[in-house]
Amino acid sequence: MEPDFIVIGSGPAGCAVASRLSEDPRHHVLLLEAGPGQRQGLLGSNAALAALVYGTRPSAYNWGFDSLPDPGLNGRISYNPLGRGLGGGTTLNTLMYMRGNPLDYDGWAQAGNPGWGWSDVLPYFKKSENNQTFSAPGDPYHGQGGPVWVEELRTDNPWHATLRQACQEAGWPYNPDLNGAAQDGFRPTQVMMKGGERHHAGQAYILPHLGQRPNLQLQCDSPVTRVLFEGQRAVGVEVLQGGTKRQIRARKEVIVSSGGLLSAKLLQLSGVGDGALLQRMGLPTVAHLPAVGQHLQDHVDVILGHHIPGDPHLVGISPTGALNLWRAMRRWRQERRGMCTTNFAEVTGFMRLATNAPVPDIQYEFVVALAMDHGRDVYAKHGLSTHVLLLHPKSRGSVQIASPRWEDAPAIDYRYFSHPDDLATMVEGVRRVLQVYDTPTMRSRVKADLRTAHCRSDEDYAQFCRNVAGTNYHPTSSCRMGPDAATSVVDARLRVHGLQGLRVIDSSIFPTIPGGNTTAPSYMVGEKGAALLREDWQ
C-alpha cells in the first residue's frame, strides 16, 4: 500500500515522528533508514563499547565525515562521527539528557516562531521522557511514562563525589536537576539508558510497535537519493534498495529527518536550495531557498587532560586498566552495573562566565578516561579529560553538496572562531575549569596537566584552543525555522517555504543552537512536529 507519510531518517526526531503518526491507524507511515537495522549483542547494548568501536572511524554504522580545513582551527580538519542505522546518532552518542535553557526556546519564539517558546515546548519534552529519578506524578519539569528512558548512571564511581567536592571548593554549586528550575551548576550526568544499557531512538519509539501496528513500516539499508516533486509539491522519494533505485510515492507528505548535516544535503540534491549552487552542480532548481545549508552551528569543544596515576575507577590503557575492564565486563554481564555502563562523560555542568549573563556560557563534561580526538588518541595512562563546550556560538558555518552524487560526503565548513567573541569566551572557559584542578581535592590526586601546562597568557590559551578544538557532535540549524524565506528554510509548522507536502523535522530546524546537548531537543522537535502533522491531517 502506498504510504501516507514517508519519514527519511531514523534518528531521535524521525523515530518520534514515525511512531506518533502511526498511533492513528488511519495514517500509513513508512520510515526509511540509510543504514542497518538493530545491532545485536555487546556492541548494540553496551554504551561504552558502541561509542568506542563505531564512533572512531567510518563504517556501516557511522558516516564519519571530515570537515573542510578550518582557518579557525589553524587549517585543521574536524572529524564528524555521525550515527548511521536505526536510532541514528543515539547509537553512538554519550547519551546525555540535557535540554538547554528555557530562554533558548523563548528566543526561538521571539525570532518569529510562534508556538516554540519554553512553555510551548516543555510539554513535548515531558511527553518523550520516562525519568526514573524525577518520577513523582505531576513533576513540573519531567515526564513519566514516555518512550525515552532517562536514569542515573550505574557506574558507582567514587569520582562523582570527588568532583562534586572539587567543584564546590572552586565555588561552583551542585545542582540536583540540570533540566529543572535552574541550569547552573554540576551533577552526575543523567543518561538515556535503560537498566544499564544504551537505549536508542529505535528501541524507544519504533521496535515496540513493529508488527503491532500494521500501518507502521521500517525499511533499513534504504538511502534516499532525492525527494520527488510534481511542480511545487513533494510526491515521494527515490530510494536505493539492493543496488537498484526505485520510487515510492507518498499520499500526503514527505518528512525529512536526516539531521543537522544530511537534511540540508538531501534538500539540495532534490533541487531545494541556493539556485546558484544547484546550477553549478547541474541540478534543476525546484525552489530557490538560499538559507538551505547556511547558518550551521555547533558547540565547538576544547578537551583538557590530567594524569591521575593508577586510579582503578578511571578507564585507562595499562595492565591494571585491562584487569579492571575484564572485571567490569563480568559485572556488567551479571548486574548491568559498574564501569562498563559508563557514558564516559559522567559529570557535567553549566557556568556563566559573568554574573550578569542571562544564560550559562560554557558546559563542562568530565570524562573518566584520557581520550582526545574523538577517542582516536588515547593516552596510555589513567586520568580525566575535561570537555569545554561553547554553548552559544556567534560563528556560523555551512554545509553544502560537493557534487550531484548522493554517495559523496557534503562539504562541511564550520568556521569555528570566525567571530572573535567565541575564542575569547572559550579561553575564559578553559581558564575557569583549571581552577577545579587547582583545588586541594584535585592537587592531591593529579600528577600532571597534559595539555595546558605550557600556557601562561591569553594568547597561549587562544593558540592552544585553535590547535585542539573540534566538534562536540551537535551540528544544527542548517535548515533553520523562521518567517522569512530569504533567511530560513521552514516555517513555524516546519513546512518548507514555498513548497507543499514537504517538512523538515529534526535538529537542522533549530533557529539557534540550544545551550546543552542536542538529543533531548531533537526528541522534542520530533514530538511537536508529529503533533503539528496530526493537527493538519485530522
What are these regions (language model features)?
Residues M1-Q538:
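N-terminal redox-cofactor-binding region of secreted/periplasmic oxidoreductases
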